[in-house]
Amino acid sequence: MELRNIKSFIKVAEFENFSKAAEVLGYAQSTITLQIQQLEQELGVNLF
């Protein structure tokens, strides 16, 4: 489990918006989506 994925999850939850989280973290929106998908696979649950 990557710490950056958890940080991205927290920002998405905070802003309720993948694009805004990506902007704040300095990532592309597609990167945030991939990170959330990785977390979902590791945890075996849908997060959003």
What are these regions (language model features)?
Residues 9:
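Short, basic/aromatic recognition patches that contact phosphate-bearing ligands
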Residues 40-48:
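A short LG(V/I)-centered, amphipathic sequence patch enriched
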Residues 12-26:
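Short helix-boundary/capping micro-motifs
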